[in-house]
């Protein structure tokens, strides 16, 4: 997904600590991973002032991992709204890694940031690897939502990349049908 977005030197905001694949993908695509602080003293929530300080003219997107891996933090609506406001102000794409969305506990509620930002372009990632404990089957998806008009080139690039791939394996397709009903 980064190859379709980033040109050499473009920046993407990524939480720290993060799941290392995000940094690797940004770097592999020729971009620069710019890490924003998620402070343990603040329940591992993103530091909005730090995010704002790190936005430049080269910043294309912001990544959130909610629920967060590795911290386990689940972002409340107020935190998500602040991220939406920053993304809106700076015309950033939102990449939302929500692979742990079905694994919240103690009555907590997961809120997808895309549901709060219909005017922004959001790319939401999820799958069955974690929630159904079938990581080896590599079953996942990305959902493009919001203002797709501002992301035509990105969508076209993503289509080209996906067309170069074969479909998932047959047992995995059967598992998806069973798991999602």
Language model regions located:
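Phosphate-binding glycine-rich loop
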Residues: 1-11
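Active-site phosphate-binding strand-loop segment of PLP-dependent enzymes
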Residues: 34, 39-108
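Conserved coil-to-alpha-helix start sites within the AMP-binding
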Residues: 18-22
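Helix C-cap/helix->beta junction micro-motif
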Residues: 29, 89-90, 120
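Conserved core segment of the aminotransferase class I/II
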Residues: 115-181
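A short helix-loop-beta submotif of the ANL/AMP-binding
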Residues: 27-34
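Hydrophobic/aromatic ligand-binding patch that stacks against planar heteroaromatic rings
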Residues: 4, 24-26, 86
